[in-house]
UniProtKB/Swiss-Prot annotation:
GO terms for cellular component: membrane. Pfam families: Rhomboid. The active site is at S150, H204. It catalyses: Cleaves type-1 transmembrane domains using a catalytic dyad composed of serine and histidine that are contributed by different transmembrane domains. One of its GO terms (molecular function) is serine-type endopeptidase activity. It is an enzyme of class 3 (hydrolase). It is a multi-pass membrane protein. Belongs to the peptidase S54 family. The gene is ROM3. It comes from Toxoplasma gondii. This is Rhomboid-like protease 3.
Amino acid sequence: MASSDGSDVETQSLLNSGDRTLRSWKDTVFPGISWDKSIVWITVAQIIMYIISCVLSRSYEPNERTLMLLGAAYAPAFSNFQLWRVVTPLFLHATILHLVLNLVFILHISLRLEERYGTKKFLVTYFLSAIVGNLLSMLMQPWALSVGASTAGFGIIGGMAAEVSVVWCKLSEELKRIYSMDICILAVLIYFLSFGRTVDTFGHLGGFLAGVALVCYYNKEIEDLPKWFRVLFYGCSALCATILVVSPPLLLLRYPYRVAATS
């Protein structure tokens, strides 16, 4: 009579192997994911808001009226002192595909940045990138309705690019190829999978500049920084400061009576 010990060991080995494979897949796609990461809770909030927007629209996808009601970036509405529209677009998405693609890629890259710099610095980078991006977007494309987390996503990409460029000369050729490919693929995917039929180029640009400026600031005490580091840091910081200071008054003065036509 055959002992069951061997089969039990084999079964347990298979289960452990499957568990390791699952953990390996999870760590590859979402490195270091856990409930103590703020980006995980932001992602949950974005999913909840998408469900709410679909319920209000009575459809599987939110309509423009609902997105407008819930806080999409729209310059004429911002000019009516609806200042929250620089942040609320982060939690709104136009389609389920838009939601999934934005969140998967942004979650993937954000986990690394939050682990590296901590929750406070990560949140500053995430939200300030979105604010700068949405302000620039509304200033340059005032009649476009914009939603999505890609302004913040490009801030994270900008931060990654800045961090890698600072230590570029110290990386091996293999790491250089890996980082270059990672940043390029993420940028291209988020760029081409943005809201609607158009791409919010200015929103992405503003977010990217803010991410570069902030991560340069976090690393400014590193020894042996490249000669161009200060130019990059002060240049991006000056552009972001200009957007933050100039955009709100221009938007408030430029469209003071237009919001009534959009209701």
